[in-house]
Amino acid sequence: MTENARTTPEAVRTVACVGAGVIGGGWVAHFLGRGYRVVAWDPAPDAESRLRGLVSSAWPALEELGPAEGASMANLRVVDTLAEAVADADFVQESAPERLDLKIDLLAEIDAATPEGVVIASSTSGYSMSEMQVGARTPGRLVVGHPFNPPYLVPLVEVVGGERSERWAVDWASDFYRAAGKSVITMERELPGFIGNRIQEAAWREALHMVAEGEATVEQIDLAMTSGPGLRWAFFGPCLTFHLAGGEGGMAHMLDHFGPSLKSPWTRLEAPELTAGLRDRMVAGTDEVVAGRSTAELIAQRDRRLIAVARALEEVERAEAAERAGADA
């Protein structure tokens, strides 16, 4: 909270959602599930019916997760104009289609209509805030708050400002998303595609190469991920996974021992040069994540979580099989 913000992140009560498609509607569902009042606007003629249908479809999942006190679909209000949507907002989430000209104009309109001191975030997945904030009169309060679909179930939000964004707005947005139950990465600089999408895109491109060359089928690729690294990445991520691959020597041993394999023809992506500086940054970063835990502790944690994920998937699969059997009876 700084003198520039109208309210503290924890005191937010009303969120304006501009754009009510798949991402915008997912945000609406998430904010409602967290107990906020949501005012939504979308220029499409059938926007309200589609939005309420999306929220209704998402609500059982939100109830299973455990909604916040006071959470209700009745807290959604859909209005006819952008000005109405943002008039009393404590925070604005923009989720318009991915067209740069549209984003520039819309963010300028939102900025002009939104009360002073209210942070405005864009859900963009493809543009930098530096590109989008050029038409705004007060660009300092504009940031990116990039979610993953569906926003009401996938917790990650990547927050980053543009060249004209002010630090207080980036920090305020990060704190607000955390208060709203999200897992937040506050990026220190703009990066095309952000972080999660770049990692995801690397795997996706390699999958396309393997299919194109007849090396693997779509089914094999998906099975390789869901029954292999995907299970571990659900809770440790690639860096901590490779740290454990180094045994007691951790990331340092893994890089020193297996570093040359980066030059092996296992991917079409060109590997970075494993310089001493890169090695040291990887080791130091991993040490921060490990935070003093021993390899034995990490292995025990990994195994518990693998078992929990496997059991949860088995339970869901049994329930789905029972539903199919009941439908066929």
Swiss-Prot record:
Database matches in Gene3D superfamilies: N-(1-d-carboxylethyl)-l-norvaline Dehydrogenase, domain 2, NAD(P)-binding Rossmann-like Domain
Keyword annotations: Cytoplasm, NAD, Oxidoreductase
Protein's cellular compartments: Cytoplasm
InterPro entries linked to this entry: 3-OHacyl-CoA_DH_NAD-bd (IPR006176), 3HC_DH_C (IPR006108), 6-PGluconate_DH-like_C_sf (IPR008927), 6PGD_dom2 (IPR013328), L-carnitine_dehydrogenase (IPR026578), NAD(P)-bd_dom_sf (IPR036291)
Pathway listed: Amine and polyamine metabolism; carnitine metabolism
Catalysis performed (reactions): carnitine + NAD(+) = 3-dehydrocarnitine + NADH + H(+)
Disulfide bonding pattern of the chain: none
Residues that span the membrane, as ranges: none
One matching Pfam family: 3HCDH
BP-aspect Gene Ontology terms: carnitine metabolic process; catabolic process; fatty acid metabolic process
Main location: cytoplasm
Binding of NAD(+), residues: 19-24
Enzyme Commission number(s): 1.1.1.108
GO cellular component, one term: cytoplasm
Gene Ontology molecular function: any one: carnitine 3-dehydrogenase activity
Record's keyword annotation contains Metal-binding: no
Known function: Catalyzes the NAD(+)-dependent oxidation of L-carnitine to 3-dehydrocarnitine.
Assembly and binders: Homodimer.
Family per similarity comment: Belongs to the 3-hydroxyacyl-CoA dehydrogenase family. L-carnitine dehydrogenase subfamily.
Name the UniProt record assigns to this protein: L-carnitine dehydrogenase
Source organism (scientific name): Nocardiopsis dassonvillei (strain ATCC 23218 / DSM 43111 / CIP 107115 / JCM 7437 / KCTC 9190 / NBRC 14626 / NCTC 10488 / NRRL B-5397 / IMRU 509) (Actinomadura dassonvillei)
